[in-house]
Amino acid sequence: MSGMPKSSKMLQYINYRMRVTIQDGRVIVGRFLAFDKHMNVVICDAEEFRRIRQKGKEDREEKRTLGMILIRGETVVSMSVEAPPPEEAKLAATSKMPPQIPGGPGIGRAVGRGMPMGGMGMGGSGPMSGLTGPVRGVGGPAPHSMMPGGGVPPPMGRGGFPPQGFPPGGPSPQGAFNNNPNNNNGGPPQGFPPGGPIGRGGFPPQGFPPGGPMGGPNLNNGNMPPQGFPPGGPMGRGGFPPQGFPPGGPNFNNMPPQGFPPGGPMGRGGFQRK
């Protein structure tokens, strides 16, 4: 409708059902949508009616559905009103706002990822609205992964931190004795020194030599004596003799000890002194 004055009489027939007759005798009936100064016409829901003449018979009319078509103004012979516009077309023409579609159960909201209108210089107790992260369930990880404490803590004694209320270091070494039924972490009960009972592989309390008390079992395979004893252990067990004693322990190979002539005492089967 470009170039047409607003006071044109053709404007009042918009959305009417019109009958357009063209030069070849066909009649187009449809809803009148638009026109221009050249009288080019746009028709929707168009139906074509053609009259066919037969010799010796009456003329018959043939109908064909076309849909939306554009009719050139140079072929238009006449136009007439066929029917008034439908009810929905009247409501759309009279109302200023288009008919609104009723909303569903959900509510669409914009995801806040931009900076707030007040800028970064605005003071406030909480974080700015543009820096709060994505809305839960939209553009981010799953909600359960954002909750604190979601991971499984590492087991005690393997490099992880102990739970709250437990001493650091995890359970005591293997072999420590636990006679406290309420103590389930393998450590010594309250009131006992660390390392478990004496002589079971733990560290001795302060003031005692390592390896257990005197007379207790030596757990180092007899190689090193406890603190305060000469090296070598008891004589005759394969260790080094104390200072002032010959090495080797008792003589079992018919050799006299150091400082005695070879052969041993006379009269016992040894070698006699020359």
Swiss-Prot record:
GO terms for biological process: mRNA splicing, via spliceosome. One of its GO terms (cellular component) is U1 snRNP. Its main location: cytoplasm. The keyword Hydrolase does not apply. Keywords: Cytoplasm, mRNA processing, mRNA splicing, Nucleus, Repeat, Ribonucleoprotein, RNA-binding, Spliceosome. Residues 5-85 form the Sm domain. It is found in: Cytoplasm, Cytosol; Nucleus. Residues 148-274 are annotated as: Disordered. Transmembrane segments: none annotated. SMART domains: Sm (SM00651). Pfam families: LSM. The keyword Lipid metabolism does not apply. One of its GO terms (molecular function) is snRNP binding. Residues 265-274 have a biased composition (Gly residues). Belongs to the snRNP SmB/SmN family. This is Small nuclear ribonucleoprotein-associated protein B. It comes from Dictyostelium discoideum (Social amoeba).
